[in-house]
Regions:
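Catalytic loop of the DD-peptidase/beta-lactamase superfamily, centered on the K-T-G motif
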Residues: 1-135
Length: 135
């Protein structure tokens, strides 16, 4: 992964965290679009199937407009708050966006065949543990 790609990913996550406004103050997405990303669209069996994806790493999450969204933190042992959203790539990249506490996390990895679902929750919880320890 090139350094520019990492920087772009981080800027994109920060923009989402700021409700669609980039770090330079320019509106890139409407707030409603970001809210749609955080609003679960799955019901019933589709929601149950989504929880099983990635080695059961999506328990407690639903799926909005192109992103997973945390609906029940206790089902995922998450230290983040409900409403946190993001996505993970097939080779292990991981994004967490949480406008409620102003967290934009990007974990970069490109490894075919990795079991990324084994550690994404740990990475997320380590970040949140450090945030909550400072409050």
């Amino acid at each position: 992964m090139h350094n520019e790609s990492v920087q772009d990913y981080i800027l994109f996550a920060e923009m989402l965290c700021n409700g669609g406004v980039g770090v330079n103050g320019t509106r890139i997405l409407q707030r409603e679009t970001v809210d749609d990303m955080r609003t679960n669209r799955l019901q019933g069996e589709a929601l149950e199937d989504f929880a099983k994806f990635g080695g059961w790493s999506k328990g407690g999450y639903g799926y909005g407009l192109g992103a997973r969204t945390l609906m029940d933190r206790e089902k995922n042992n998450a230290l983040s708050e409900n409403g946190e959203f993001g996505w993970d790539g097939a080779r292990g990249c991981y994004v967490v966006v949480d406008p409620n506490v102003q967290v934009a996390l990007f974990y970069a990895q490109q490894e075919a065949g990795s079991t990324w679902w084994d550690w994404h929750g740990t990475v997320r919880n380590m970040v949140y543990a450090s945030i909550w320890a400072d409050r």
